[in-house]
A protein has these predicted regions:
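Short, surface-exposed, low-complexity cationic segments
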Residues: 16-39
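Extended alpha-helical interaction segments
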Residues: 1-5, 11-16, 20-24
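Charged interaction scaffolds used for protein-protein
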Residues: 1-9, 31-44, 64-120
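Short, well-structured hydrophobic secondary-structure segments
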Residues: 48-52
């Protein structure tokens, strides 16, 4: 998947590094042990169409680019004429396709009440 910010096209990668970056910020700590909870934390926000969550997910998925836009540039991209509803849809579909997020997405889809907003 690609997005265009400030006339430059960037790749998005929803692989292991993406998960590591999410897990570094979204985790549960029990008895001094941190357990990554990144994907589980952001998917409900994507389903409910939370723009701040979408911005965070896009920013972390941009890790694959040598020169990636700043979080502020991603925010501005979303605030402009971007078809944000389509972008939510596309990101959720990509998360279902990625080899490293597919199983978690399947489990989340089965457990969350509003999963009809995630297309097959």
């Amino acid at each position: 998947m690609e997005i265009k910010i400030n006339e430059k096209t960037y790749k998005l990668n929803f692989g292991i590094m993406f998960l590591r970056k999410l897990d570094a910020v979204h985790y549960i700590e029990e008895k001094g042990i941190k357990i990554g909870f990144g994907l589980n934390s952001v998917v409900p926000g994507l389903i409910s169409r939370n723009a701040a969550t979408l911005s965070e997910v896009l920013y972390y998925a941009l890790w694959v680019n040598n020169e990636r836009p700043t979080q502020a540039q991603v925010d501005e991209f979303l605030e402009k004429d971007t078809n944000i509803e389509q972008l939510f849809h596309d990101v959720l579909i990509e998360l279902q396709k990625s080899n490293v997020t597919r199983t978690s997405m399947k489990n989340l889809k089965a457990s969350l009440p509003e999963t009809d907003r995630i297309s097959e």
